[in-house]
């Protein structure tokens, strides 16, 4: 399993997701948020993403929205030959599941955490 997690999103959602996760799990040095800000375009975002991952050997990427600019830019990198896993629809259970997998040294079913952790609170 990858040891580093890159969070990509529209706006600062990825930064706040990291902050919220740290409230539960404590400080995390292996999570790197890469926000697409309103003043930036796809090329700006690509450069920012590449500058974050250039020194990382092993990482996985969670994106906020399938079909959104952050996810599309990162998926194009996969088509260009970069090697990493990409999951869209990120949420806190996915991030916590990833961190638990790293801590325990075990594989985590990211899809399970992404879709099976919903419940009705009625």
Predicted ranges, named:
Residues 2-62, 66-122:
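N-terminal loops that bind phosphate or other acidic moieties
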